[in-house]
Swiss-Prot record:
One of its GO terms (molecular function) is 4-(cytidine 5'-diphospho)-2-C-methyl-D-erythritol kinase activity. The active site is at K32, D157. It is an enzyme of class 2 (transferase). It comes from Actinobacillus succinogenes (strain ATCC 55618 / DSM 22257 / CCUG 43843 / 130Z). PANTHER family: 4-DIPHOSPHOCYTIDYL-2-C-METHYL-D-ERYTHRITOL KINASE, CHLOROPLASTIC. Keywords: ATP-binding, Isoprene biosynthesis, Kinase, Nucleotide-binding, Transferase. The gene is ispE. The keyword ATP-binding applies. InterPro entries: GHMP_kinase_C_dom, GHMP_kinase_C_sf, GHMP_kinase_N_dom, IspE, Ribosomal_Su5_D2-typ_SF, Ribsml_uS5_D2-typ_fold_subgr. Catalyzes the phosphorylation of the position 2 hydroxy group of 4-diphosphocytidyl-2C-methyl-D-erythritol. Its EC number is 2.7.1.148. GO terms for biological process: isopentenyl diphosphate biosynthetic process, methylerythritol 4-phosphate pathway; terpenoid biosynthetic process. This is 4-diphosphocytidyl-2-C-methyl-D-erythritol kinase.
Amino acid sequence: MKKNYRFSTALSQFSADSFRQGKSLRFPSPAKLNLFLYINGKRADGYHELQTLFQFLDYGDWLEISARADGEIHLTPQLPGVKEEDNLIYRAAHILQQNTGCTLGADIRLDKILPMGGGVGGGSSNAATVLVALNYLWKTRLSLSELADLGVKLGADVPIFIHGNAAFAEGVGEKLTDCEPPEKWFVVLKPETSISTALVFTHPDLPRNTPKRPLTRLLTEEYGNDCEKVVRNCYPEVEETLTWLLKYAPSRLTGTGACVFAEFDNEKSAQAVFDMKPASVSGFVAKGCNRSPLHQWLDKIS
């Protein structure tokens, strides 16, 4: 079956066989945006205290997964420059095996569309989808909370994808409160550069003392990203792309970048701006969604 990277289209066409790809089952791995990101302090262990609002996008990768009896994990295709044992997909499968004693293995095929290192959660989303999907296929019966405890060992953003709802995150990202921000349309652009998260979080100009505010107040104020100024100053490609996008709509950085996004009230307006984008940047148009497409998909097949 032809894959559609807008999951709502696949969901609307759902049938008993629509999630099958041969012997494999297909699972969505959606993108996310940080609608705002504020850094409230730095802890003694080096981690930063933050407040951020996560929302999923109706767009992302697909993972085709089937169980195998020999306990081996086979992943295709291999990501360029990433050793198999360092790949988050491979590590997610192994951590579930190790923590449940499951003797089954898996064949996993990644259909990758999300940019790597873009701040839209591609790797974290892939890891979360593998944990949730294999928990279903292997019948290991861990709760979402137990899966999230495994996921955080793989990356700070993995639990939000396992959690499955748009959420306000505090602390180092581990304290989650369900939230329902407006589900707007977004133009997401990826400048031709890669961001060093370590550079951003160690930069002397990074704000580290933004006062904590209650969610009710944050939702009514203009959204911002404390990492944006540093990234714009250090990466001219991001500065150029964001400056262009700001001519058309409220726009900002997601996470530490490199992706930037603009929000619109409807698809037509978003698509019109996207169609004018500079040729040097890639990107996509997608709608925000407060319920993860992965969990919507699981609701259908369960």
